[in-house]
């Protein structure tokens, strides 16, 4: 599974309240949630992400409240993958279950810049920046990879039954 897109870059400790503020949790439509993704940090995020982007972030991306809507909103907004130095465990699994690839890369925010063109091999974790710089992140394998390839946990379970 290869993903390529330009980078939107964020720092450390991007919590789920930033990803999708609590006032929107009563809504279930992914497209509506997408319009409010990252709103407290970047009100223009939806416009920037809609063409398809890869988020690069620092430590503990997705920390805070456990809300599946965070991964759902990012994916619906146009986020193709997230590369971060570390992820909150629950967010990591919610992302996989929603079909949103998440790759861990040490020093991600030092190695990759805003606007860089990045190609990610989700299985191997290889990341190519601007066609030349090669980085090695942690790939995804086994059942989590199968879930991603099928588009998320619900699709995976439907195909398995």
UniProtKB/Swiss-Prot annotation:
Enzyme Commission no: 4.2.1.33
Pathway the protein acts in: Amino-acid biosynthesis; L-leucine biosynthesis; L-leucine from 3-methyl-2-oxobutanoate: step 2/4
Signal peptide: none
InterPro entries registered for this protein in UniProt: Aconitase/3IPM_dehydase_swvl, AconitaseA/IPMdHydase_ssu_swvl, IPMI_Swivel, LeuD, LeuD_type2/HacB/DmdB
GO molecular function: 3-isopropylmalate dehydratase activity
GO BP term, example: L-leucine biosynthetic process
The reaction(s) this protein catalyses: (2R,3S)-3-isopropylmalate = (2S)-2-isopropylmalate
Top-rank lineage group of the source organism: Archaea
Pfam families linked: Aconitase_C
Protein function: Catalyzes the isomerization between 2-isopropylmalate and 3-isopropylmalate, via the formation of 2-isopropylmaleate.
Subunit structure, interactors included: Heterodimer of LeuC and LeuD.
This protein's name: 3-isopropylmalate dehydratase small subunit
Organism of this sequence: Sulfolobus acidocaldarius (strain ATCC 33909 / DSM 639 / JCM 8929 / NBRC 15157 / NCIMB 11770)
